[in-house]
Amino acid sequence: MSILAEKLSSILKRYDELTALLSSAEVISDIKKLTELSKEQSSIEEISIASKEYLSVLEGIKENKELLEDKELSELAKEELKILEIQKSELETAIKQLLIPKDPNDDKNIYLELRAGTGGDEAGIFVGDLFKAYCRYADLKKWKVEIVSSSENSVGGYKEIIALIKGKGVYSRLKFEAGTHRVQRVPETESQGRIHTSAITVAIMPEVDDVEVSINPSDLKIEVFRAGGHGGQCVNTTDSAVRITHLPTNISVSMQDEKSQHKNKDKALKILKARLYEKQIEEQQLANAKDRKEQVGSGDRSERIRTYNYPQNRLSEHRINLTLYSLEEIMLSGSLDEVINPLIAHAQSQFE
C-alpha cells in the first residue's frame, strides 16, 4: 500500500470511530464533547468521501491488472484500466488539495473594517466604493451583510465602516483582503484632470465567542459619552455612546450607532474581542512564516497589497504579481473571485 493510501485509510478509520462515538450515550449527554467531535467529523467528511472513492479505484486497478492475464477479458480490462488511471490521477489532485492544512477560522463569520487613510476626501469616497463591491460580492455568495458602525465624512464618503458578514466560508475567501488598498483616479472635484493617489486600510476579523477570547473585566476601561453627529452636533441627549479600551493592549473601540447604551456596549465588546483575536492570528502568522516558503501577505494593515488604477482600468495585486484590466467591471459587479481565487491558489501552493 502506498503512503497516500495508508494516510487515507487512517482518515477513514478515524471517521468511522467518530461515527460510533457520536452515537454513544456518553457523548450525546456531553454537549461540549458532542460539539467537539461533530466539528472534527465535519472537518474530515469531504476527504473521507474522496478517500473511499480513491481506495475503490485502486482496488479496481488491481483487479483489472490481474484480468490482463485472461485472454477473453484482457481487452476489456485494458479499456477499464485507462478510465481508472484517469480517475486515479484526478482524485489524487483533489485529495492533495483536501490534505492541505485547513485554517481553523475559515468557516467563521467576519467583521469587515474599512478605514480612510491618506488622500483626504477621496480616500473616504473609496471606502464607500470598496464596501459596495464587497456587498455585491456577498450577494453573489448568498452571504448576509449587517453594518455595525459607520462614520460619514462631509462629501458622501466614509471615515470608517464596520460590518458583520455572515455565511458559508466568509473568512476563507475574504481573509486575504486585509491590508492597505491604494486607489489612483481623477476626483470629480479635480478641474485640471490630475490623478490623485489615496489609500484605505481593510481589516478582516473573525467573529469569535466567549470561549475563544476571554477578557478579564478588570482589564477594560469603559467610558460613556453623548453621541455626536456631523460637525460635532449632539444627536442624543443621553450618554448612549460607549468607548471600551483593553488596557493591556491599548486597543480601543467606540460605538454610538445605537440609541441604547447597552446595545452600543454589546457591539463594542464584540468588535474588541474580534480585534484581540485578529492580533493573536497576526502573531501566530509571524511565528508560522519561518516554517513557510512564502506568505500571501501577513494580513498586516500597513502592508500595501493592491492598487486600483481607474484611468488604466487596472487592478494590480502586488503579492502575486497579478494584473487585471477589468477594474470597473470587478467593482461594479462584485466579481472579486478574479482576484481571490488566484490568491487562494497561491497560498495553497506554499504547502505543496
From Swiss-Prot:
Pfam families: PCRF, RF-1. Disulfide bonds: none annotated. GO terms for cellular component: cytoplasm. It is found in: Cytoplasm. Its main location: cytoplasm. The keyword Cytoplasm applies. NCBIfam families: prfA (TIGR00019), PRK00591.1 (NF001859). Belongs to the prokaryotic/mitochondrial release factor family. This is Peptide chain release factor 1. It comes from Helicobacter pylori (strain P12).
